[in-house]
Amino acid sequence: MRQRTSEDVQSAVRTFSLSTLITASRAFLAFSLFFLIVKDEYSIALSIFLLGVASDFLDGHIARKRGEDSSLGGFFDHSCDALFVTTGFLALAISGSETYFLIGLIPISFIEYSWDFITNRTPLTPTFIGRFNGISYYVLIGIWLGVKALDAEISFEFENVLVFCARFLCFTTLFSIFVGIQNRIAVKF
C-alpha cells in the first residue's frame, strides 16, 4: 500500500475548499437553470444564470487568493463551465431557440481541450479562441435569457442576429477543436 504524502493531504484539503464548493455549486445551478428554462420561468432562470456567472468569476479568484488553485481545480472549473453552458443551450433549444447545434459541440470541445490533462495530467492550456468561445457561450445565453425574462418583443432581425451569433460560435468551436487536434499532432511528430 502506498504511503500518503503531504501532497496527497494538501490535495485532499483543496478538494473540499471554499473555491471548490463554489465551483461545484455551478453544477447544481446548471440543473436548476435547465428546468427553469424548460418551464418558461425565465426571470428566475436569469437569476440562477447570474449566480452561475458570479460563481465562475469568484471561484478562481478565491482559489488563487487562498492558495487553493491546482490543475485538478482548473479541470473541475472547466468541467462545471461546460456542463453549465451545455445545459443552458439544451434548455434554450427545447424551448424553441436555435441553439441545438452547440449542444454536442461544447462537450466535444471540452474533451479535446482537456485530453492532455485527462491522459497525461499536464496542465490545461487555454488558447485565445478557447477563451473567446467560453466567454461567448455565457454572453449568448445571458442575452437570450434576458430577452425572454423581459418578455421583450424582439424583432425578426434581432432574433436572426442571435441565431447568427450561435452559428458563428459553432464555427469558432469547430475551429478550436481542429486547432487543438492539429497542435497535439504537431507535438507528436
Q: Predicted segment positions?
A:
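Membrane-embedded alpha-helical segments that form the functional core of polytopic membrane enzymes
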Residues: T20-F75, G88-A91, E98-P107, F156-F175
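A feature for the membrane-embedded catalytic helix bundles of lipid/isoprenoid biosynthetic enzymes
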Residues: M1-F16, H78-F189
